[in-house]
Structures are given as structure tokens and as C-alpha cells.
Design a protein with these regions (language model features):
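Membrane-embedded beta-barrel scaffold of Gram-negative outer-membrane proteins
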Residues: 366-368, 374-380, 384-392, 557, ...
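Conserved C-terminal beta-signal and adjacent last beta-strands/turns
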Residues: 442, 558, 589, 673-775
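Acidic/polar loop-and-plug regions of large Gram-negative outer-membrane beta-barrel proteins
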Residues: 282-286, 299-366, 383-420, 463-492
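Structural signature of Gram-negative outer-membrane beta-barrels, strongest in the C-terminal barrel
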Residues: 303, 420, 439-451, 486-612, ...
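Surface-exposed extracellular loop regions of Gram-negative outer-membrane beta-barrel proteins
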Residues: 321-333, 450-455, 547-590, 602-625, ...
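Acidic, small-polar-rich N-terminal luminal/periplasmic segments of exported/outer-membrane proteins
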Residues: 30, 35, 94-242, 591
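Gram-negative outer-membrane beta-barrel transporters
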Residues: 609-611, 625-710
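Outer-membrane beta-barrel translocator/receptor signature
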Residues: 204-207, 217-298, 304-310, 359, ...
Length: 775
């Protein structure tokens, strides 16, 4: 051992069972303020004995490492592990991993490297998946690279409980988690809402993608659009200890070229300062006929990691331009059977255009006041602008009308432009202390979001007839394009308190908390600027969870959580027009069991029920929350490394979804629109034994049929998609090079995707090639 000299430390209560050393170090990080850095191969095959008692953090570390031959050096709360060298000294670290011990750190990758051992849960901090009473999955940058993911949608589809409601090349991306919609506007970045593009999130800025299944309002506050099925948080890149200079060139069909640079460097004493820059230039033909898609993106991340102080800042700018984007269509009420989907490269409305610009800045500061008290504050600001040449289906007289049974429709052109300005903040304190034999982790937090949004809608007069199989270019748009004016102003604030109690040597973990939410919404006339309506409301969102570990590798868990969605202002077509409905709550009950099979495979079985009020009119045409959508489900997941070099990601979800408490029994017991009864995923990634550096991968995605309406008279067929890929890692002229090739929708399957009552044709067979060079 070669520790640096430290000041006398106060002992803390430590209870860590015998288990693999990596898991034991994660628990040590969560019970103390130590940040532990190490290379993956340092811990290979190492196990830790059980330790307990009132120990200083360093003494606890010594006991865990006893007999392993692993050395450590310490600077403040930063600890670096290394293997002893037979000739003396230590072995240099190759790839550094950080335990998820305190705020701001990333959990180490799990076996196989595609997912992480834990992730952030907002107010509850960073937790190992085996220690949290929720169902989560945390994707690593390795997976993003190897699958050649382009946007966030390409990542989250790896889990059967998550489905994309839109296809690539559209005007935006929306998701579904546990049968409920989650929009791109409800994705958080580094724990803050409202700071990523409301249309699509490019993966080039991402280090991790963290998915929570089930309502997440307690963790980070109300999402801007009130999603309740789950929560998605993305984590931006930071510089590693090893310098990085990577250039990637990519190609995607039909002829879309991407160039990316990824630079990272740490410097200063103990590599305390880090800088990470990513730049992307993309352009060329998209997967749609006569389509073009471009992206210009730059992202700069700076961070400082000191003994007690940690700070980070990000600046992100992206500009997207899509000529002929993939659109959605609706169906006339008389349609009882959908026509066959057209080819995947057909755009229903030739001549559409989308341009989008987003700029974001954000910063986060964390400080350890003592070994057992940490505070943080984070803030960010985003401006977004969107300009669209947008089609509208009408009848020959110009009145709104959808597509008929044979795919015929009439279309006029509109301009729909919008802007948004968002300020977002988060602050909190986390304290650790004991009451007798019970350990507490108490978190106090506050969240704030203000979002101003504006729009302008200009309608043309020319109308042309068209068909989904042989679309006609949309006509000329209006002669005047209006400037977007303020339409709404939303402020969401909340205060939360939570306590996680540990009993019986951390074999029982109990979490309880409550968040008080305040909602303020004002609407404005975009012509006069006058305030037309508004409301103020508040509500409390409690949470409860328990984890019981009968064995060190088995976690039995249960939770109760609530989602909260801001209320709506009743429209003019109802008897109670102008009435303000209170924010409504969605309730989840969940239980499950997680098993970590010798650190190689983790499996999860989860049972859940989510009930959400449904807004509709009663027999007197009074609008309110009179019905309920209830989703009851079973989830099975497994991920990790089956054998050395064979990686697995498999999952299945079964949802019994029905409408209950409906006014007058209308549609009572029916299946809600857009919710599949079953979904399946199977992904394998294999390092071939006959060619060093060559890996093959494949993925199957199955989604059952769904209804397009609550009356269950119009059904959308299910689909199965197959993807294949390969990569080859080698060295050329002393430089590490990785070649990748992927094919999505290998069979060129034609199928519909549904988002609410609208559908779009899925992208056809798509080829992707890339080469990455590390200088």
C-alpha cells in the first residue's frame, strides 16, 4: 500500500457483504465520500470479504483490498487503484473507470460493456441497479458507437418496454415507455429538463443514456410535457484521463455523409481539469425519395474534479435541416381497415422542409462540505427555433379532412414556425448519518423550470389531390410568412425531501420521500399579445420503495410512485369552456426481483400497474378527468456477457391495458389506442474466434398489433424488424482503427408506426458504414 498522508478522518458506519470486488467498491463509494478510479483489468477475478463496523473510509478501503495484491494512491477523496508490478512500482492504468459513489460520477460498465452497473436517479443520487427499488437501464457510449446510433431513438429501442412512435427522418422523435407516450421535450440532460432539442438528440454529445421505467416526477420534478410512463436522462461527455483524438467518417443510405471529431484532454495537477469537444458535419441524401438531411453540431464540455469541489460546464449548438421529412397521416372515421403501408422511402408530402436551431449552455457545481454532507447546484438555458413547410390534409373546400380507405387525400401547404426559451435549475443537499444501527442518506432538493413558447401559423390557399402510394408535390405556400409570437409561459417549481434507510448490513434498503410541485401556466393571443387564460395549482407527489437482499446477488424490490402532469384549460367546444383543470396524478405500483449471476449476466423480472386519468367529455359535454387508462404489465430483461466475447441484451414486455371508469361505460374495458400487448427484443454481439478484432452483431425487434382508436375498430398490424452488423478493430500505422458496418431492417419490412391516432411508414432497409481513427 502507498497512501498519501491524510488528515485524521472521522469513522463512519460501514456494512459491505462478501461479493465481487467491483461491487464492494461501489458500495464503499456510496457509504463514504471516496471517488475510486481503476482500470477494468485491475479487478479481474477479485472478490472482497465482508467488512462492517465504524471505520474510517481509508481503513475500510484497506480491508477490502487486503490480500488482493492491489495498491492504491490517494489525493483527498480521489483514490486510484493499480496492480503491483513484480519488478517494482505499479502497472499503468489503461482505461479509467469511476465508481458511482457520489454525485456527478458515472457507474462502471457492466460485463460486456454495453450497459452500466448503475445510473442517476435525480434527487436519490447515483445508485447501483441492485440497490434501487426501480427498473432502470443505463446504456454506455460503447453501445452507441457499435450500433452506429444516430439519435437518441436508436438507443432506447434496445429495450422491449420502450418503443419509438416515429421513424427516422421525421420532424421529431417520440417514445413510449410501459404503454405511455414520452416526448423528446421531456428528455433531461445531466438531470435538467428543457435543455435538449425538442425534436431529436444527436448521440455525438452523449456518454450515457439512462432510462427509468415508470413515473419519474419525484426524481427531477414535473417534466415540461408531463410524461408519466418513464423518464430518459442523457449524460454529456467528459474528458478521460487518457488523451483522446478521434476522427470518424460515416456513410448512410441513400448517400448521407458524416464527419466527426472527438477531442479530449485532462491537464493540471492530478489531471484535475478536463476539456472535451465534439464536432459533427452531416449532409447528403436521406432514406426518403428526393430527401436531404443535414446536421451541424458542436459541443464543448469542461470540468474540474478537486478533492472536495467538482464543477462542469457544457455549451452545445446544433442546426438540423431536412428537405422532405417523413410525415404522419390520420385516417377518416369511416376507415375500418388500414391499407398496406407504402415503401419505406415514400414521403407522403413531397416538398416539406424542416430547419431547426438549438443552443444550450449549462453548468453544475458540487461540493463536499464534510465527508458526509454534499451540496450541488446546476443551471442551464436553451433557445430553440423551428421553421417548417408543413402540409395539412383537407377536403376540396379546404376543410380539415384525413386520408380515406384507399389512401386518397387533398393537401394544402402551411408555414408553422415556433420558438422556445427555457431556463432550468436544480439544487440540493445530501447528508449521510446514523441513528443507532440504521444508516440514513437524506436528500433535500429544489427544481425550477421556466419555458416561454411562441408560434406562427400561416395557411395557403392552393389545394392538390394526392395518394399515399403516388404522392403529389405539395402546392405553393402562403405569400406571407408570419413571425412567431409568444403563445404560452410555463413555470414549474418543486421542493423535495427523501430518506434512504439501510438496515441489516445493507440487506434492507427503504426509501421514502415527497415532492411538492407548483405549476403556473399562462396562455397568450399570438396576434394581440394579450393574456387569454392561465392557472396556478400545486400538488404533492409521494414515493416509497424497498429493496431486500436475501443473497448478495439477489434484490427483491417494490415501489409506489406518482407521476404528475400539469392540468389543461378546457377548450371552447365544451360547456365548461375556460375552466382550469387541476394537475392530475398517475399512480404506479411495482414489484420485482433482480439477480446478478456472478457479475456476468443480470436478469430482472418486474410486475407493474400504472393508472392515469383520461380526459374526455361526459354526457353533458363537460370536459374533465372522467375515465382512466390502466396498464398492468410484466417485464423480463437480461443483459451482460454470456461467455467471454458473447454479449447479450434481451427483453420482453407484456401489457394488459384497458380503459376503466369511462363515462356511461363507453369503450369500457377496451384497449387504449397505441398500446401493444407484447414486445420483444433480442440482441447479440460476438467477438469471433477466427479473426482477431472482428465482431458480429444482430438484433430482432418485435411489436404486436395496436388499435388506432379507443373504440377498437381500427387495428394497426404488428411487425418484426431484423438488424445486422459487424465491426473490425485493428491497428494501421500505429493508430487504432475501427471499421463498422450495420444494416437496419435487413428484410426491408414495410410496416406502420403509430403515434396517437396518426401513423407513418417505417424506414426501409438502411445501410451504415463508418471508420474511426484514434490519433
Amino acid at each position: 500500500m502507498a497512501p498519501a498522508v491524510q488528515a485524521q478522518e472521522a469513522p463512519v458506519s460501514v456494512n459491505i457483504p462478501a461479493q465481487p470486488l467491483g461491487d464492494a467498491l461501489l458500495q464503499l463509494g456510496s457509504q463514504t465520500s471516496l471517488q475510486i478510479f481503476y482500470s477494468q483489468d485491475v479487478l479481474a477475478g477479485q472478490n472482497a470479504r465482508a467488512i462492517s463496523g465504524n471505520l474510517s473510509p481509508e481503513e475500510a478501503l484497506r480491508q477490502l483490498l487486503q490480500g488482493t495484491g492491489i495498491q492504491y494512491t490517494r489525493n483527498g477523496n480521489n483514490v486510484t487503484l493499480s496492480r503491483a508490478n513484480p519488478t517494482g512500482g505499479t502497472v499503468q492504468l489503461e482505461a479509467v473507470t469511476v465508481t458511482a459513489g457520489i454525485l456527478g460520477n458515472l457507474a462502471e460498465p457492466y460485463a460486456g460493456g454495453q450497459v452500466a452497473t448503475g445510473g442517476s436517479l435525480g434527487l436519490l443520487g447515483s445508485e447501483d441497479v441492485m440497490d434501487t427499488p426501480f427498473s432502470t437501464v443505463n446504456y454506455t457510449s460503447e453501445l452507441l458507437y457499435d450500433q452506429q446510433a444516430r439519435t437518441l431513438a436508436d438507443v432506447v429501442v434496445n429495450d422491449a418496454s420502450v418503443r419509438n412512435l416515429t421513424s427516422s427522418g421525421g420532424f421529431g422523435e417520440d417514445f413510449q415507455i410501459r404503454g405511455f407516450a414520452v416526448g423528446s421535450g421531456d428528455v433531461s440532460v445531466n438531470g435538467l429538463y428543457g435543455l435538449v432539442s425538442s425534436s431529436r438528440v444527436p448521440v455525438q454529445i452523449l456518454e450515457r443514456v439512462e432510462v427509468l421505467k415508470g413515473p419519474g416526477a419525484f426524481m427531477r420534478g414535473i417534466p415540461p410535457n408531463g410524461s408519466i410512463g418513464g423518464a430518459i436522462n442523457v449524460v454529456t461527455k467528459r474528458a478521460d484521463d487518457d488523451p483522446l483524438a478521434r476522427v470518424t467518417l460515416g456513410y448512410a443510405s441513400k448517400a448521407n455523409i458524416t464527419g466527426q471529431i472527438d477531442l479530449g484532454q485532462r491537464f493540471g495537477e492530478d489531471n484535475a481539469w478536463g476539456v472535451r469537444f465534439n464536432g459533427v458535419k452531416r449532409g447528403g441524401e436521406s432514406t426518403l425519395r428526393d430527401g436531404k438531411q443535414g446536421l451541424d453540431m458542436g459541443a464543448l464540455g469542461i470540468d474540474y474534479r478537486g478533492t472536495r469541489l467538482r464543477w462542469s460546464a457544457d455549451a452545445i449548438h446544433q442546426e438540423d435541416v431536412i428537405e422532405n421529412f417523413r410525415s404522419q397521416i390520420g385516417w377518416q372515421p369511416t376507415v375500418t381497415a388500414l391499407p398496406a403501408p407504402p415503401d419505406g422511402d415514400i414521403n407522403f408530402y413531397p416538398g416539406t422542409r424542416l430547419s431547426q436551431r438549438d443552443s444550450t449552455i449549462m453548468s453544475r457545481l458540487e461540493y463536499d462540505f464534510t465527508d458526509n454532507l454534499t451540496g450541488h447546484i446546476a443551471a442551464g438555458y436553451r433557445e430553440g427555433k423551428v421553421r417548417q413547410i408543413f402540409p395539412v390534409t383537407v377536403n376540396p373546400a379546404g376543410v380539415r379532412q384525413s386520408v380515406d380507405q384507399d389512401g386518397n387525400f387533398n393537401v394544402m401547404t402551411t408555414y408553422y414556425d415556433s420558438y422556445s426559451k427555457t431556463s432550468s435549475g436544480d439544487a440540493g443537499l445530501t447528508a449521510r448519518f446514523n441513528t443507532g444501527s440504521v444508516k440514513h442518506r437524506v436528500a433535500l432538493g429544489a427544481n425550477y423550470l421556466n419555458q416561454e413558447a411562441g408560434n406562427a401559423y400561416s395557411t395557403g390557399s392552393a389545394i392538390v389531390a394526392s395518394n399515399i402510394y403516388d404522392p403529389t408535390p405539395i402546392p405553393d405556400g402562403p405569400s406571407v410568412r408570419l413571425t412567431p409570437q409568444k403563445a404560452s409561459d410555463t413555470t414549474l417549481t418543486s421542493f423535495a425531501l427523501a430518506d434512504t434507510l439501510s438496515f441489516a448490513e445493507d440487506r434492507i434498503l427503504l426509501t421514502a420521500g415527497v415532492r411538492h410541485q407548483r405549476v403556473q401556466v399562462d396562455s397568450y393571443n399570438t396576434t394581440t399579445g394579450a393574456r387569454t387564460s392561465g392557472y396556478r395549482a400545486s400538488a404533492n407527489s409521494p414515493i416509497g420503495g424497498i429493496v431486500v437482499k436475501p443473497l448478495h446477488n439477489v434484490s427483491v424490490y417494490a415501489n409506489f410512485a406518482q407521476g404528475l402532469t400539469r392540468g389543461t384549460i378546457v377548450g371552447d367546444t365544451y360547456e365548461n369552456r375556460g375552466a382550469v383543470l387541476a394537475p392530475y396524478k398517475s399512480k404506479q405500483y411495482e414489484t420485482g426481483v433482480k439477480v446478478d449471476w456472478d457479475g456476468n449476466i443480470t436478469t430482472t423480472l418486474a410486475l407493474f400497474q400504472i393508472a392515469r386519468p383520461s380526459g374526455q367529455a361526459d354526457d353533458n359535454n363537460v370536459y374533465g378527468y372522467f375515465g382512466e387508462q390502466r396498464n398492468r404489465g410484466l417485464e423480463l430483461t437480461g443483459y451482460g456477457e454470456i461467455t467471454r466475447g458473447l454479449r447479450l441484451m434481451a427483453s420482453a414486455a407484456y401489457i394488459n391495458s384497458e380503459l376503466t371508469k369511462t363515462p356511461g361505460g363507453v369503450s369500457q374495458g377496451n384497449r387504449p389506442a397505441g398500446v401493444p400487448a407484447s414486445t420483444y427484443n433480442l440482441g447479440l454481439d460476438w467477438d469471433t474466434p477466427w479473426v482477431q478484432g472482428l465482431s458480429l452483431n444482430g438484433r430482432a425487434i418485435r411489436t404486436s398489433s395496436v388499435y388506432l382508436n379507443n373504440t377498437n375498430t381500427l387495428r394497426l398490424p404488428g411487425y418484426t424488424r431484423f438488424d445486422l452488423g459487424a465491426r473490425y478493430a485493428t491497428t494501421i500505422a500505429g493508430k487504432d482503427v475501427v471499421f463498422r458496418a450495420n444494416v437496419e431492417n435487413v428484410a426491408d419490412k414495410k410496416y406502420w408506426l403509430a403515434s396517437g391516432s396518426f401513423v407513418t411508414n417505417a424506414a426501409g432497409r438502411t445501410y451504415m458504414l463508418s471508420a474511426s481513427i484514434n490519433y
